[in-house]
Every structure is written in C-alpha cells, then in structure tokens.
Amino acid sequence: PIVCWSIEAFERNDRVSDIIVVVNERVSNMVNMLIDEAGYTKVRAVIPGGSERVDSTRSALDLLKQAGIPDGAKILIHDSVRPFVEQQSIDGCIDSLDQFNAATVAYASTDTILLTEDLGERKVVRSVPDRTNAFRAQTPQAFRFGTITKAYELATADPDFHPTDDTRVVVDYLPNEPVAIVAGSETNLKITTQADMPIAENIARSLDPEHAKQEAKARMHAVFAEAFSQMHKH
C-alpha cells in the first residue's frame, strides 16, 4: 500500500530515528496491521488525523510536545501519498536544518505561473512571476520543532487561518524566518486522482525493474483501488 512505501523511505534512512503516522481514523486499524506485518522498527505511534491537513499536523505536534521533544529537534512532515520520495530529498531536509530553521522540498516549475485576481465574475491575470523563481512545493517539509510549534500557535489564534501546507504556516506567521529550498524531483508524485495512476505505475516500474510490466501495473491498480475506496467512504 501507498502508506507503506512512504514509511519505508524513512524507515531505511539511518538519520531518521522516529516515525509518527497520522491517518484517517477509519483506516487506522488497517494501517496498524500493515505496520505490524512489515515489522517497521521506527514507528512510535499511529494517531488519528483531522478533517484538514493542518489538523493532522497539529495532532502530531501535540503528541511530540507531550513527549517532551526539545525545541531544537529536527522534524520532517511528509505526505503519505508521495510514496516515491528520494533519499537525497530526506537527507537534504535534514542537512538544511543545520543552517535554517525551516526547509521544504520543491521542484522547479517548467510551466509559466499566473497570479490572478477577481474582476467581476471572472479571474484575470494580475502578474506573471519570473519562472526562474517559481517552484512547485513537495514534501518532506522540515522544521526545528520550536519553529513549527511557534508558527502554529500564532496561526491558531488567527480566525482567518487557512493554509494549504506547513511551510505556508511558517511563511505567513513567521515572515522573518527563511525557508530553504531542497531540490525535489518530478517522480516525487502526489497521488490524488485517477489521472495520476498511469504516471505512478511508470514510476513504480522504474523503481522495481525486476517486476514485469503487467505485474507492476496490477500491483499499483490494487493499491489505488483500495485508496480511492477509502476516500469515497469519507
């Protein structure tokens, strides 16, 4: 399953000491079973997430705070639906926290990005940023524990708090805190729709060349079928 691919990426990294898995409560029993079967040694807890991403992050941060994690600890937050994250991205995040208090994996955009605004009932182009400075955010996103908890404390007090990811929380609420860019990759795909399936199958085959084409395709279809089945239950 997708979540296992993501866990394994961090499980096999010697620099990662502990893993917390945040999942929808509906599938927590299944995830616990998969973790037990795989024998992951770094998973310390499987906890229920919230209705939105930021709620899930806060649940994990609260658990870490209760455990007495020091402010200087390095924390990496990853989308479990990015199962093809590379070791160099994980290492890059960890290394970046030696110099910065926040970092994110990102991939240089090959598309022109348009910033828009409302004009009546239509969206119109407000500006076109230089593409050399445009990146697509990926994960992991990395923080010193004290930095991300402080950002969330400030954000929680804001009634207009609606960020899309954890880096955005730091950028918005700790504007003087630089966030370093760690080189990502095109294969660090976020699997969210059926349209992502053929791309994910190709990536899976490239990572597992010993498997035949049809075998890899069948495996990925089974994974996605289960994932989408769970999504439709929500």
Annotated model-derived regions:
Residues 51-119, 138:
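Conserved beta-loop-beta/alpha segment of the NTase-like Rossmann-fold superfamily
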Residues 4-72, 158:
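Conserved N-terminal catalytic core of the sugar/cofactor nucleotidyltransferase
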Residues 134-234:
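Conserved alpha/beta core of the MobA/IspD/sugar-nucleotide pyrophosphorylase nucleotidyltransferase superfamily
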Residues 115-143:
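Short, flexible, basic/aromatic active-site loop/helix in glycosyltransferases
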